[in-house]
Amino acid sequence: MDINLDPSRDDLPLMANTSHLLVKHYVLDLDVDFGSRVLEGNIVLFFGDGNRCKKQSSSSQETFQMESEEAYILRTAEPCHVPKMDSNTFSPKMGHREFAVFGKSDQDAFDNDGNHDNKEHDSESSSSKYCCDTGNHGREDFLLVLDCCDLSVLKVEEVDVAAVPDLEKFTKAPNLTAAPEKRRCEIVRDLVALPADAWREQLDCYTRCSQAPGCGELLFDSDKWSLQIRKKGVPTAADFPHAIRIWYKTKPEGQSVTWTSDQDGRPCVYTMGSPINNRALFPCQEPPVAMSTWQATVRAAASFVVLMSGEKSAKPTPLREGYMSWHYYVTMPMPASTFTIAVGCWTEMKPKTSPLDDLTEHTLPLRPSDADFRYGNTCSHMEYPCRFQSASAATQNIIPYRVFAPVCLEGACREALLWLIPSCLSAAHSVLGTHPFSRLDILIVPTNFPSLGMASPHIIFLSQSTLTGTSHLCGTRLCHEIAHAWFGLAIGARDWTEEWLSEGFATHLEDIFWAEAQQLPPHEALEQQELRACLRWHRLQDELQNSPEGMQVLRPNKEKTGHVSASGASVVKNGLNPEKGFMQVHYLKGYFLLRFLARTLGEETYFPFLRKFVHLFHGQLILSQDFLQMLLESIPENKRFGLSVENIVGDWLECPGIPKALQEERKAKDCSPSRLVRQVGSEVAKWIRVNRRPGKRQRRKREAAFEKLSPDQIVLLLEWLLEQKTLSPQTLHRLQQTYHLQEQDAEVRHRWCELVIKHKYTKAYDQVKRFLQEDQAMGIYLYGELMVSEDARLQQLAHRCFELVKGHMDKASAQVVTEMLF
């Protein structure tokens, strides 16, 4: 694998050799320093046996590809001189200047190899740097490879778990005749294998072991994408230390976290869904198969709130004057990419209700659904304390929740968000059953957040753009992110290129949840869903016209989907393409596929199946064929309408462009549009007539003729009006007044800004400027529209807005805009 891939252009390498050792638990211990914009401290990793030692499922056996292991064995080299350090007195605050000095020629070679240690320390390095000689010096050492990028690793050491008292209560009797190294490995193997009902004791053991002293430094090196660790004289993964501690600090420019200011102008830092995931936050195993639990202690100034994707609502512990410590944990194994942290001066927004009605503290009882227990209480995932086995969790339609935001957004949160949460959570439960996670925090993130929302275990990030206009955009986006609790988190894609398994499901389910949350009658729900399908059809056509064919395929690896190397390493195709984050093909084609299946097989068949699928596959990683095969096998052959896994994969997942079945469906809809779509068409015709006859008398005559439209209808209206070659300033002014466009939600205002730019409506240029500054999650493409207008004033507006926001803009977004402007 080429470790020198261009990080701005190529595929994303997943370097960790998970087939040899698997991280089972992480313990993070970090300090937040807003002055230097770094997180600093240590992380302890507890390992279990890798995938090569485990029996693969039949699905895994079909897709697991073995390659040569030669690239993952390091020939033993003579280490550079390493002065001894007392690990018990090591402080994470120690800078590089407290480490050993070695010759400049060695440092130059280190940098050329891709080391990311700070460049200013030309004559210094970590105490555990070793000289790598590819020549054969005799024995081979096992090399542990972790995914890592833009971290300053200071020290790596083995943890002496054997020094922790009373572990024998939870582990097998120690073999006192065995070597100390072997005893330590045996203790960790026993610890990670404790049963689910001993999770509290296991968590306590992890905590105490993470605080044990070091018992020897390990040799390490790093390149652009990984951290490599070895212990001299240890040739196999089985004998490699199973508990290691890594002292490190992040870098201000690291892409896993964003250091910025919130809407009140106060400093904050948060994980923003980077293409490189969390590897610039902590050394980890990135491949999704590396599912682990974790716990984290984070210290920050007392004025800050620390939020994380943890199972309990952490209460801060006072430390020295002016500082607090926050502790979170999870017991459900998840990929490291799902770890989320946000630190800022957030304020909890509480609904104004009586204590009995306060749904943030109480949950409403619901009759247990027979559907949730038809399939039995046996789960198919690895053992952990699972909510799907709990009768009380099955009846909990509204899980406890909290909302955090800057103080200046309190009014907007109360008006647009707080009252929606119970109905959206309850709607999701009515469709899919047991909530996979026990609680939910919702955070309104800073303006530079690059999307409308992001879901992680126990926490959802929402853009402030969702709080504008009516509750419609906020409700649909909240439903989308809630859906990810099941599809994307509780059930994940085993191959990250199959993004549709997360986004397609969430997009399809958001409409179902939202209709249920509004308690719409079936015919109104159907009308609303047909309207949104029409909108998505327009967007999909635009996406496919403006994207390369290679990025239109939902299963780009085809028959190699799910394949990894012998070590467990792999590559995510287009994972680092900055434009990919702004594409919606996986959302839209995935949505239309699921909609097609639900309509073809019947919703009365599809949604009960989906509930069953969730019950059987939660806590696991899947491929497309796992879902499709179970779906079709649950339906008698004479009711499958000729569908097969092969033709669905071939027509929908492995071909670019628009599937034939979708073309035929949309052609039929064009001939017979739904009522809400017809209503929009009628209004468009009125506006076209107004635009042709702009006289004052005609305007007055038709003033009351325009019907009230929903936000989705207004979006469709504006999209159709964008197809008109010219619209007069008078028509645009009247449009704005009729629908109060500047007060609508961000989706509507985005289309309005497109009209303003296309027709150079100067009176609304300030609204475009405001949108680019306050709605960065949606404004990227407007920069392109401004530039292709070939209007000097509009191009100047684009440059001015970019200058104002680029210092705080998401890096991928800034890169795309830079390419548009320069």
Swiss-Prot record:
A motif (Nucleolar localization signal) lies at residues 692-702. Its EC number is 3.4.11.-. It is found in: Nucleus, Nucleolus. The keyword Transmembrane helix does not apply. Binds 1 zinc ion per subunit. The active site is at E481 (proton acceptor). One of its GO terms (biological process) is proteolysis. Its cofactor is Zn(2+). One of its GO terms (cellular component) is nucleolus. One of its GO terms (molecular function) is zinc ion binding. Zn(2+) binds at H480, H484, E503. SUPFAM superfamilies: ARM repeat, Leukotriene A4 hydrolase N-terminal domain, Metalloproteases ('zincins'), catalytic domain. The keyword DNA damage does not apply. Keywords: Aminopeptidase, Hydrolase, Metal-binding, Metalloprotease, Nucleus, Protease, Zinc. It comes from the Eukaryota. The record marks Y587 as: Transition state stabilizer. Belongs to the peptidase M1 family. Aminopeptidase which catalyzes the hydrolysis of amino acid residues from the N-terminus of peptide or protein substrates. This is Aminopeptidase O. It comes from Rattus norvegicus (Rat).
